[in-house]
Every structure is written in C-alpha cells, then in structure tokens.
Design a protein with these regions (language model features):
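A glycine-rich, often tryptophan-bearing local segment used as a flexible ligand/cofactor-contacting loop or short
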Residues: 124-190
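Active-site beta->alpha N-cap acidic-glycine motif
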Residues: 242-250, 260-350, 354
Length: 612
C-alpha cells in the first residue's frame, strides 16, 4: 500500500486523477440515488399483505366472545352519542360486548361478564339495578361509569362506593385536563379543552380513590379515578367530553378495570407532505420576502426543504410526499403532460433517498367529484365533466409518477383537500388497482372524506390523518394524545404552501412555524420513544395486521398467556398490568412505556409473560 501511495505521489498526471476522482464520486452519488429508488420499491412490496390473505376487522370481530356488558338508555341523547364512540372503541380494542338498551330490552344477569360499562349520566331509569351493580362489584365485578353522573337519589346510594367523600348538585368548568404521567402516554401535563363548558360533577374523593386526571386549576376536581370496593373496582370518567377526539381517554379508563388489559395497536407515525413534489406553489410570498428576501421558488429550494430534511434527520421521520401534477382547474379531461420535470425529480429523488415514499395527490387540485356533488360556497372547486374525464386525469397522474420515478411503487392516494366522492372512490378501486391506500381525514370537515383505521371490504386500506400543519391547536393536541393511547399512532400532514396562507400561520414566519413543528415532534417522540417512524404504505401494512388480530387472554397469578388469531408475522399489543409486573417473556419483546403500561411486539402466535 505504501508503495502504491508513493507511486501515485510521483504520478505526473495526478491532477487529472483528482478530476477523474471527482467525476467518479458524482457518478457514485447518482447511481446510489437511483439504486435507492429501487431499494424503496422492495421495501414497499413487503409492507402490504397479499390481498387474498387479508382479514378485515369487521370479519375478525364476528366471533369474539362477549366479556363486557354495556348499559345505555336510548332516551338520553348523551347515552346515544356515547355508544356511537364506544362501539368503535370496543371494536378496535377487540373487546366483545353485549349492548342492553334499558328502553328496549331486559338487563341480563351480570354473572357472565368480566366488566360492565354504564353509558348513562342519569341513573334514575336503572332504579334498583344501581344497587345490584354495587353488590356485583363488591363480589369482584369491574364497572366503568363513562359519562359525568348527575347527582340524584340513586347516584347518592352508590357515590360512597365510588370513593366520593363530598359532592354538589352542580357541575364545574373543565377547560384544562391534567393527565398523570403514569396513566396515559403523553401525560405529565395539561391539555386545553376547546369549547369548554361545565362538564364535570363537582366532587371530592377520599384516600381510597386513585386519581389519574383532574382539572388543572386550584380546585383540582377529579376527572378520571378508580376506587376499589370489596373484591372489585369502579372506574369513573367525570370530564364529560365523549367524541372521536377523546376515544383514547376512554380506552385508557377501560384498561384500568381488569388485572391485566390487552388490546392491539398500530405502533406507527407518519408525516405526510401534501402537494409535494409539485410545481412552484402559487400564493402570497409577502412573509417569505419579509423574512428572507427570496422568491417563493428559491425559498423552498434553499430554506424550507433543507430545514424539513434536518427535522427528519433529528427525529428519524420518513416523509411521505404525494405528487400533484399541476394547479390548473381544467376538468374537461383534456390532459396536458407536465414539461417542467426537473423540480419533481430533484425533490422526489431526495425524498426517496432520505428513506421516504411517494404517492398520488392529483392531476390537478380538483377533487374526484362529478356534477351531482355541490360544493356550494364551502369549497372553491369545480366538478369533473364526466367519469371519463376523471379517469383520464388519474391516468395521466399515474403515468407521470411512473415516468418520473421508475422502479418505485406508488400505492397511496391522498384526495385533494381530503375530498373524495363515492363515484371517485369507486373509480379508484375499479380502474387503478395499484392504489391500495386512501389517506384522508380522521375527523369530519368541510365535505371531507372521513375515515377509521381499517381495511375496507373492497380491500382498500383506509388511513386517516389526525392532525395537520405546523400550528398544532388545542383540539389537535387533545386528539394527538388521545390517539397515542387509542391506536398508538400519529398521522400528520402539512403543505409546502402553508407559508403562503395566513390562515395556516404564514404571518408567523417559517422560523416560528418550524419551531412549533419541532416542538410537536419532540413531545411525540419523548412521550413515545418506541413509536415506529413509518412511511404511508408501511403504516397500511400495520393497519392490515392490526385489523385482523384477535387476542385470547388467559391470566393466572403467575403468568399471562396470549393466543393470537389471524397472526401473520408480527403484531403490536398494548398491555396494562394493574396487578403485578412482567417478568420473563416467550414469543415476543416487551417495552415499558409509562406507569404500568407496556408495548408488546409479538413475534409468534403464542406469547407467555411471567407475572411477578
């Protein structure tokens, strides 16, 4: 080697050697970039299960034995609304339930159930059943009162058994809820309640009660607590907010009831970049000019994208970008091929090489809707002139994506503005089988295509996005912590042109917006360090596995045995050990998250965990 070095040092064309070396290095970089694209394609193929092996959640839950009795009253509006949420909560937790509407059916004997959930704020219609519930708990039963109770004669009979030492007939304001850090993932802080009202029963609890959440004020009114009674246990939810954004609070409360609670989760975090790559965003560049003195094009190339890559590197994020071909509003179906391709290839290839993924957003930004859809004054869009026009536009988008990124599998579709008509969805399924995932909205919005985390009966993976933008408002914060505890998932999207829209925070400037996004990522991965960073199709594979999974639990004093039906290759399961601590494990890996909450990665269809 020393001789070779000496030879090179004496080589009279060594300057030429340096130049050739530079060109060789550039060639290697270009080859690596291209090979990175091929590598990504292989990864995505492994993410999805084969279509003919997928068991949907609807199919999976059909044969689950009922272990929980739900009592509700169809004459109470809040009871009906609560059941709408709890029906999905129990489905996703793979808990078999029997529903007893006291207005329409007899209340069955309690002896065949492990738990009872009462979805009633007014217990008067239950009459003496309230006493029976107390007696059942004393003998070892477990009961959750999920709605804020109204003080009356029957509640007065049972309130001491709930751990209550003092109560009033009125309610108090819940504008902030503080969550104990040992109770819920992301706790150890308070969360602002949007549109707060007097939703909590004004009570005090004694030393026998264990409080997990309370109002973040001087009164510290208990909002979630448990109280042992006899051989059993009561859990009380007293915060009064029962909606999709708080499902995780109820899942966490329900998990307090039994000695060991288990339920499947997704374990995944995805960050979407909508409209990326795309033509140069149009809009008001006032604040970009104010802060950087740059054009919109130069800002995105030299400031925004390097900063986004830095955030990804710091937090381990793998972006999923969804392509938009152009921003024109032509809905005739007379498609025009995009000629300015350099920008697409530059950003798209960098995203792929970073470990990310590309998907589809739109030929333009007009949602897939026909003339039967009326946007009225809600959205500034046109409808497509015909089914054939929609099809031609999607065909051109897919052609363009394949041409720009050959060898890359693009399987994810994000509807423009999260709007997708029934006809548009049917067209995607029928005409474009390469699209296997639709990613839209978790919550109801302006004509939004609203989803659950599930596989639809036609095989499409529904992957809703929970939060958006760099300005994470109070409602989104509440939803984010809820979903960490419901599905152990984060799905977020933002647009590059957020910086051009005052409604999305443009006036704040990119430095402040970047700081807020960084703060959200810090909170997320500090709260859940074992949360997997995934691309969209990888999360879709997780949704397929999670939806199919059914867990058979057997608990003794010394061990927990889990039998997993519809197990493919791996599964993630949340375990709360209210009694004992885990020891040796067979068939999986256990990670402590917080308090008595653990994440199980099951590697086999049978898992045994020692209880100490």
């Amino acid at each position: 080697m020393a001789g070779m070095i000496k030879y090179l040092q004496s080589f009279r064309f060594k300057g030429m050697t340096v130049i050739l070396g530079v060109f060789l290095a550039i060639s290697v970089v270009l080859w690596t970039e291209r090979s990175g694209i091929q590598y990504q394609a292989e990864i995505k193929k492994k993410a999805y299960l084969d279509r003919d092996t997928v068991v949907t959640e609807t199919q999976a839950v059909k044969n689950i034995e009922s272990s929980c009795l739900v009592l509700m009253d169809s004459s109470q509006a809040d009871s009906v609304e609560a059941w709408e949420q709890f029906e999905r909560i129990f489905m996703d937790m793979k808990t078999g339930v029997d529903l007893a509407d006291i207005r329409q059916s007899e209340i069955p004997d309690f002896s065949g159930y492990e738990t009872i959930v009462v979805l009633m704020s007014d217990l008067n219609p239950l009459k003496d059943v309230v006493i029976k519930i107390g007696n059942w708990v004393e003998k070892g039963g477990r009961v959750l009162f999920a709605l804020t109770l109204q003080k009356d004669i029957y509640v007065s009979i049972i309130e001491q058994k709930l751990g209550i030492t003092d109560s009033d007939y009125g309610n108090v304001l819940v504008d902030k809820i503080y969550i104990d850090d040992d109770f819920m993932i992301g706790g150890g802080r308070s969360f602002q309640i949007p549109d707060a009202y007097d939703s909590a029963w004004e009570v005090s609890v004694g030393e026998t009660a264990k409080v997990y959440a309370w109002t973040d004020d001087e009164n510290k009114v208990p909002l979630i607590w448990e109280n042992s009674y006899g051989k059993g246990k009561f859990v009380v939810d007293n915060f009064g907010l029962c909606e999709k954004a708080t499902r995780g609070f109820f899942a966490a409360s329900y998990s307090l009831l039994t000695d060991v609670m288990v339920y499947p989760v997704l374990n995944g975090s995805v960050f979407y970049l909508d409209d990326f790559p795309s033509p140069v965003p149009s809009g008001d560049g006032t604040y970009i000019k104010r802060d950087y003195g740059l054009s919109i094009k130069a800002f995105y190339t030299n400031i925004w994208w390097p900063d986004m890559l830095d955030l990804a590197e710091e937090h381990g994020v793998k972006y999923t970008g969804v392509i938009i071909d152009n921003y024109e509003d032509d809905v005739s179906g007379d498609v025009v091929e995009q000629e300015d391709v350099q920008r697409f290839q530059y950003f798209g290839n960098m995203l792929l090489h970073q470990g990310g993924e590309l998907g589809y957003h739109g030929y333009n930004h007009q949602p897939l809707s026909l003339s039967n859809v009326d946007y009225a004054n809600i959205l500034p869009y046109k409808t497509w002139e015909s089914y054939d026009a929609m099809k031609k536009a999607m065909t051109e988008l897919i052609r363009f994506g394949k041409e720009m990124f050959p060898g890359t599998e693009l399987s994810v579709y994000v509807p423009p503005s999260n709007v997708l008509s029934d006809e548009g969805r049917e067209m995607i399924v029928k005409e474009f089988p390469e699209i296997r995932t639709i990613a839209s909205n978790y919550f109801v919005g302006d004509m939004a295509y609203t989803q659950e985390f599930e596989v639809a009966e036609d095989g499409i993976v529904e992957q809703p996005r929970i939060i958006s933008g760099a300005v994470i408002d109070d409602y989104m914060e509440l939803a984010a912590v809820s979903e960490l505890n419901m599905h152990f998932v984060n799905t977020h999207f933002m647009h590059p042109d957020d910086l051009l829209d005052e409604d999305r925070g443009a006036r704040l400037g990119w430095e402040k917006l970047k700081k807020r996004l960084d703060e959200y990522m810090d909170w997320l991965y500090t709260s859940a360090p074992c949360l997997r960073n995934l691309t969209a199709s990888e999360l879709s594979g997780a949704i397929q596995r999670y939806g199919a999974l059914v867990i058979d639990k057997d608990v003794s004093d010394q061990e927990l045995n889990l039998k997993l039906d519809n197990f493919y290759d791996e599964a993630y399961i949340m375990i709360r050990m209210n009694e004992g601590t885990p020891g040796n494990i067979e068939g999986g890996e256990l990670t402590h998250i917080t308090g008595n909450l653990y994440l199980l990665r099951a590697k086999e269809k049978s898992v045994k965990i020692e209880i100490r």
